Every structure is written in structure tokens, then in C-alpha cells.
Swiss-Prot record:
It comes from Pectobacterium carotovorum subsp. carotovorum (strain PC1). InterPro entries: Aminoacid_DH-like_N_sf, Malic_enzyme_CS, Malic_N_dom, Malic_N_dom_sf, Malic_NAD-bd, Malic_OxRdtase, NAD(P)-bd_dom_sf, NAD_malic_enz_proteobac. The keyword Cell inner membrane does not apply. Transmembrane segments: none annotated. The gene is maeA. GO terms for molecular function: malate dehydrogenase (decarboxylating) (NAD+) activity; metal ion binding; NAD binding; oxaloacetate decarboxylase activity. The record marks D270 as: Important for activity. This is NAD-dependent malic enzyme. It is an enzyme of class 1 (oxidoreductase). A divalent metal cation binds at E246, D247, D270.
Amino acid sequence: MELEYESKRPLHIPYAGPILLEFPLLNKGSAFTEEERANFNLHGLLPEAVETIEEQAERAWRQYQEFKHDIEKHVYLRNIQDTNETLFYRLLDGHLSEMMPIIYTPTVGEACEHFSDIYRRARGLFISYPNRAHIDDMLQNATKQNVKVIVVTDGERILGLGDQGIGGMGIPIGKLSLYTACGGISPAYTLPVVLDVGTNNPQRLNDPLYMGWRHPRITDDEYYEFVDEFIQAVKRRWPNVLLQFEDFAQKNATPLLNRYRDEICSFNDDIQGTAAVALGSLIAASRAAGTQLRDQTVAFLGAGSAGCGIAEQIIAQMKSEGLSDEEARARVFMVDRFGLLTDKLPNLLDFQSKLVQKSELLANWDCNSDAISLLEVVRNAKPTILIGVSGQPGLFTEEIIREMHKHCARPIVMPLSNPTSRVEARPEDIIRWTEGAALVATGSPFSPVNYQDKVFPIAQCNNSYIFPGIGLGVLASGAKRITDGMLMAASRALADCSPLANNGEGALLPDLADIQQVSKRIALEVGKAAQLQGAAVVTSSDALQKAIEHNFWQPQYRSYKRTSF
């Protein structure tokens, strides 16, 4: 039976008694009214007091504060989510800045590593390769019937932690929690999915409590055929769904995105979402410095799908500001474990080959021509922006940062690797090495830095600024695909919200407390771009704004009326 969740009218439901209390989307706990307790056979199953959601949230907040360790707080919040989703989101709504690092990065990384140890209750769908003949049946088994947003992972590249098998399910669960908390997408319309294709992690395979398929990962044709079976089943079940690929390994992420982005409304947050939030941050930083992105030179440490995705977005923005493709690409330097990507390097991936530097342009460099290091790139190319997506801690050394500062008065340094333990440099070190001159944005949350009696806010270049607004914009506009223009619109809308760019002071990115308004602004621009590019039916801006407000779910209890199946 499909329930109508969007309006504020009374909700007619057929469930009663203990079954109703076990339904997280519908359970109100102690907030069921006397009339509802009588109508739904709840008398005796609840304490006498009828409470408001505010009173419930206050109790939950007090309980939350009793936990000393972040992983304990994560488990506690997940328990509330699996018991009473409306209360869970009301609690987040009042404490989002404190709780976002708990429900998502960095704590979700630890939760993924220990998924089988802390497992309490199933959420979402676990689609395993041994049961591949029954994918359609599995989708029919989903408790949510009108799914509008799916986040799917195969668990192979979880944050910077690598292959976690089905433990990777923690990422889709956390991501969809933020679609709701930040982007107002009703939890009734979201579905986390993990594709269990085995694992190559010996710790998981040898763990007697591991709950996934104990088998080495399937690869090549077997893997791609299985993913395709899943995609086709999703299209049959929910043809208008938004599908987000999450934490797939580099070798699979780009091919899957390229294959399906025009077949089903889909995007890869690690590639496109990371690129969009990074670009928005860089546009804002350039404005704050009184320049344009076309005037910057960018060095990357990490040339995987995420780094190359960011680079391509930067190049697109530079071109929109007047540079040719060749001029823009000459300003972007990609460094991986083998050194600077040049046209002499063999065995490059397709998406890397577009970002190589021409060897003849490096002829006058003072460097080791066989493997040009990041330090040598900084000395010779003199970048004004340094971006880390390597997943390796400490690689932005003091020597590299000080060398960058020699030729750049206001360097922009973005160590984006997650979780915190994998960050290329800590913000306090970057601030100190540049005597307070650097603009810093990180991938994980960091506290403000105090240096020489001045406080430096550290922007978290968090994809949560982008993907909830994209999702809301897609739902409100009815977009059938996500175009590059829609992603660019999201980046520019985020830059427009920068306190530093707008006021000359404050953080590079808006406060997380304002993220719902940021998401609405991004949704509007994404929806407009979808209409301009033919991905959605054209409406007026007013109609689009009304659709955004209509789709924006609030964690409030509705009254219930009893009905039969």
C-alpha cells in the first residue's frame, strides 16, 4: 500500500498496535494522542503521558550528550532513525552542526569498518550477486513503495578506507539522511542500496561476524552485467528515480557514470558532487581575492576520478570566463604517485589522458624529468591553488606549503581527503606555515584555528552543500537527467552564498546551520538549468520555487486516521 507523505493533511493508515510502533516512518512513540491511542490499539503499549515532538527531542538530546565516543553517538542516532524517523530528523534539525560529523564523515567511516559489529536492524536493500536472479523481487520487497532517490554503493572504495564490503552500506544510509536533513527530501522517498559483489578485504573475509557474501569480488563482465541487471530492474520499478552512485572504485566509477548518466537520471557524487562543491569554493575564494578562476594556476595531488572530475569542472569554469580549452588545461597540473601526468607517461586512464601536460612545455623546468614531484611542480608552475585528493595523510609538507607561499601572497589550500586521518595537511599547520595568509578548505570538519590572536574559520568542502540541493532541484523540476550545466549552476549558486566572497570576512562557505536555505537556492538554479538544457519541462521561476517548497519535507507529526488495506 502506498501512503501519501507530502501534504499536512491527516494520514490514513491501516497499521495498528505493535506493528505501527515498529514502523519508523509512522511511529510517534509517546506523541500519539489519546484519540490515536484508542483508534490504533495503542493503550497499554505506551506510557501515560502524551508528549510533543519538542519534548521527545529534548530527551533524546540529553541522552545523546551522555555518550563519550563518537561511534557510540552514531549508533544511538541510528537507533532513533530505525525507531522513529520523524523524531530523528527533528533532533538533527536542532543540532545539525554538531551531529553531521556523527551521522556522516568522519564517524561514518568507523561505522562502515565495524558495520557487522554494530549492526542492529536492517535498513535499505542488500542485493547480492548469488541472488542476482531475484533483483526484481528484491525491489518489490522494499518497504518504501514510491522511491524517488536511491544511493547505491558496492562498498569497494569507502571514503579513504578502501574495500569494506557490505559495511559500505553505512555510506548510502548516511548520505540519504543528509538528503532529508539538508535538502528536505522526505525519508519516505529514499532508499539506500548496497550491491554485495564480495570483498577483497581479508579482515572482512576472516571476520566470523561479517554479514556479507564471503567471496572475492567479481570483476570484469560478471561485475558490469550484474550492475546492469540492477539498473534495468530499477528502471522497471521506479523509472523516474534519481540514482546516485557512491564510493565505487576508480576503475568502475567513471565507466558506470558515462554508461548510465543519459539512460537513467543519475550522477556520481564522488566525481561530480565533489567537483561541484570544490568549484563553488574556488569561485568564492577567487572572488574574495578580487580575481577570477581563469587567473589561477592549480596543482592537484591525486589524479583519480575525484581529482580529475574537479579538474574538468575547473577547466569548464575557466573556459566560461574566456580562456580557450588549451589555455585552461595548461593551468592545471595533476600529480599522482608516479609524479606529474605528462604526455610521456604510459598506461594512463582515459579520463587522465585529457589532463596531461605537454612535455615540450616543461623543457625549461628544473626537475627530475622521469618523475616530477609535487614539490617540483610547486617550484616551477607556481600554483596559486593546491588541492589534495590523494587519500594519503601528511603529503602537503611544510616545505611544499612554504614554497607555494613564496610566490603566492594568498594561497588557496584544499586538503580534501576523508576521513580526518587521511588529510594531506592539518589546517593549523597550513595557517602557521603561511603566517596566516592561506585560505583553507578541508574535506573533513576542523575547528577554527587561532593564530597570532586571530581566528581563522576552516570551511569544510563538504558535498552536503551540493547533493541535497541537486536532489531537491531534480525532484522539483522533474528533470530526466543531470547535465554538466546543472552541476555548474549548483557550483555558482554555492559560491553566491559565500560569506567571505560577499562580505570580505567570515568563512569561505556558509554555516551548516544555513544549509537548508542554501539547498533551496541551489535547487532553484539547478531546476532552471535543467529547463534551459531541455532536461525538464519549462515552467516559470515562481512555479519552480513553489515546487521546491512543496517538496521540502519538515519533521513534524501529522494526525492519523484509521483505514483498512
